[in-house]
Amino acid sequence: MICIECGRPVNDVYKEFGKAGSGNIRLTRCASCNQTADKYVEYDFIIVFLDLFLHKAQAYRHLLFNRQPYRDFGIPIQYIKVLVVYIFFESYIKWLRFKEYEQHPSGPAFYYIDWQDDVPYDRYWFIFVTAIAEFAVYILSIILSVRFIYESRYPIIKYNYLIMAIILSSFGKGFLVLMMIWDYPFSFGSILNIFVLSSNVVAIKVFLDTTTFKAIFFVVFGFLGKLLFQSIIYLFDASMLLHLSF
């Protein structure tokens, strides 16, 4: 566990007194900064979520280091489920763009695929698999850049926590559901993309305890890796045109 204010390790974030399970707790103060080690212990999750939305580092420290037991490897199943939902939303929006392009070819599109049939419903699987691959390449590119810069200084980096930080900070993808319910312009997806990337910067900065400049470098490297992957797919099959956006 760590102090969410200064990031220093602490033995615990609260002490329980009275009967076990009574709910009577006293928050621990950090010996380094003399602030409450983790104020979010007593807060509802909606408050934590709002602070995530506001890019507050304390909220990321709480969720990554204090909310769940320490893991040497692997990531919790909850993160996997959330990631599947993210990819489903993103794939559906891409599919809608492809469908919109078929109806209005003169307008901008996310996907234009030169399939002979006019019904794109049975092609959703292709977009879904591509979205999975894009996210995987994005994460792997960030991991490679982190290894390149930090491996000599920190030979042991918990990359499972780095992946969790990226998934957690990609919560903005969940707002894509608004485009599924209401008729938002597709530019809304591009705004969400920028928001997600900025959230990734904050989460990586918190986990690695690094500078904002380095965190931006890691995210940009991941973004370029994703762009390169899309370019390779386009070169492999020239009948497919991809634009980097939601």
UniProtKB/Swiss-Prot annotation:
Tree of life domain: Eukaryota
UniProt keyword terms in alphabetical order: Endoplasmic reticulum, Glycoprotein, Golgi apparatus, Lipid metabolism, Lipid transport, Membrane, Sphingolipid metabolism, Transmembrane, Transmembrane helix, Transport
GO BP term (any one): sterol metabolic process
Membrane topology field: Multi-pass membrane protein
Glycosylated sites: 34
One GO cellular component, as annotated: cortical endoplasmic reticulum
Segments traversing the membrane: 73-93, 124-144, 162-182, 188-208, 216-236
Subcellular localization: Endoplasmic reticulum membrane; Golgi apparatus membrane
Physiological role: Mediator of sterol homeostasis involved in sterol uptake, trafficking and distribution into membranes. Also regulates the sphingolipid metabolism.
Similarity comment: Belongs to the ARV1 family.
PANTHER family according to UniProt: ARV1, PROTEIN ARV1
Protein name (record): Protein arv1 homolog
